[in-house]
Amino acid sequence: MAAKDIVYREDARTAMERGVNALADAVRVTLGPKGRNVVLEKKFGSPMIVNDGVTIAREIELENPFENMGAQLVKEVATKTNDIAGDGTTTAAVLAQAIVRAGLKNVTAGANPMILKRGIEKAVERTVEEIKSRAKPVESKEAITQVASISANDTTIGNLIADAMEKVGKDGVITVEESKGMGTSLEVVDGMNFDRGYISPYMITDPDKMEATLADPYILITDKKISAVADILPILEKVLQAGKALLIIAEDVEGEALATLVVNKLRGTLNVVAVKAPGFGDRRKAMLEDIAILTGGRVVSEEVGLKLDKAGLDLLGKARQVRVKKDETIVVDGQGDADAITKRLAQIKKQIEDTTSDFDREKLQERLAKLAGGVAVINVGAATETEMKEKKLRIEDALNATRAAVEEGIVPGGGTVYVNVIPVLNGLEPELPDERTGVDIIKRALEAPLRQIANNAGVEGSIVVEKVKESPAGVGFDALSEQYTDMIGAGIVDPAKVTRIALQNAASIAAMILTTETLVAEKVDKDKKGGMGGMGGMGGMGGMDMM
């Protein structure tokens, strides 16, 4: 085991504070409408220009291991806030820095850190309750536009996101992709889509677009691989007699079965398209069941005693239209039972609540949205790749902020709500003096986001904070026009969820830093740093930063 360096008490806490300040100072310059950008060096390719707190935080590693511990803890604040709320990462870093700074001053002056922590926790709990009680629900398209515009710092993006939400609903899937052109546009795909296309290009109906369109088709859904024509001949004859088109969704279609389908298609006997089933394993079974419920059919599976060669038209689904491209299938207006679809949606929502895996949650949300009806794609375009990446990050943040606003409502933005709730903390009556100090630390920290927004706008932050304190609730500082105004009336709003999550995460990590007494890190051998360091464990290879 390598030797360790250990630092104690004041030295430990001040080292961590230096790390906290290094990361927070790099991130805080981006806060507010007049916040600046940060340029990140990339080992390969051009530098990355960003205005996104968590992206900046993820890039920061400090040389001193003790300072780096402080920086990594603030990085965790930003990352955790991003994971839960999707936005507010810079605010969380600014709050964490303010709590750490004020808290360490009091610990140095003799306050007991454990009692301080208790006061901080009580103050945060009361503040969160108050933020929730002040939240206003987001119902109109205009309110959604305001939230998205503030987060992205761009009204055009705000309008795009509002349009997307209006078209696919609040549970709908909205994806952000890089455009090949310079413009940013919205594309909406109606109905359920999945990433599988036609098995054979001979099945297309439109050679110009290289896609197949089936009007009012029957849909055969099976988890089986179809290779023998005898398996599907009975159902093909029934569909032919009904005079309908047919979409086959199966694990695979090959051999004589595929040849028969292609020949009948080319002769004009039957308009048929075969696609592979989406997903893998248990997820494939679930997605096939989703498609069956959406279209009013059944999954023909031997697991439930259904065989392909015995299947009748009653097992087939129906849809108004199906469009099949090279690598995508879109089922428009499935004819499934509305009650069955509602029950399936409720079941998926319950699974989303119960799952602990981020990956599973993401896939379940995709299934929910596809079943609920529609996918919107925002194609991001710009003059250069650097600008496009920066814009894409802003749109993703704005999208997350908008979802959070729809979930828990909105509060006055620009750090106003934090200042508005400070008087509520006066009602807390802690028993111990150090606990009261913990409450005071939060009261002071709640001013930090507004102060930073004002400073970034070139205005004295302390004066702005005092002015907002004297103003009626909801009146804040519009940093863009440098006017004091009714924030919700002016459309300057923040999602309540983002506001509370940022504070809760910042206080949680900051309180842990305040209660730290000892730091242990691997000893850095200054003689060998960066060199080969002999063959003894190849100790110096760490200096060869070639990857």
UniProtKB/Swiss-Prot annotation:
Leading EC class: isomerase
Any GO MF annotation of the entry: isomerase activity
Disulfide bonds: none
Record-linked Pfam families: Cpn60_TCP1 (PF00118)
Catalytic activity: ATP + H2O + a folded polypeptide = ADP + phosphate + an unfolded polypeptide
The protein's Enzyme Commission number: 5.6.1.7
Domain of life: Bacteria
One of the GO biological process terms: protein refolding
Keywords annotated in UniProt: ATP-binding, Chaperone, Cytoplasm, Isomerase, Nucleotide-binding
GO cellular component: cytoplasm
Binding site residues for ATP: T30, L31, G32, P33, D87, G88, T89, T90, T91, G414, D478, A479, L480, D494
UniProt-annotated location(s): Cytoplasm
InterPro entries xref list: Chaperonin_Cpn60_CS (IPR018370), Cpn60/GroEL (IPR001844), Cpn60/GroEL/TCP-1 (IPR002423), GroEL-like_apical_dom_sf (IPR027409), GROEL-like_equatorial_sf (IPR027413), TCP-1-like_intermed_sf (IPR027410)
Function: Together with its co-chaperonin GroES, plays an essential role in assisting protein folding. The GroEL-GroES system forms a nano-cage that allows encapsulation of the non-native substrate proteins and provides a physical environment optimized to promote and accelerate protein folding.
Family: Belongs to the chaperonin (HSP60) family.
NCBIfam families recorded: GroEL, PRK00013.1, PRK12849.1, PRK12850.1, PRK12851.1
Assembly with partners or alone: Forms a cylinder of 14 subunits composed of two heptameric rings stacked back-to-back. Interacts with the co-chaperonin GroES.
Designated name of the protein: Chaperonin GroEL
Annotated organism of origin: Desulforudis audaxviator (strain MP104C)
Protein's gene: groEL
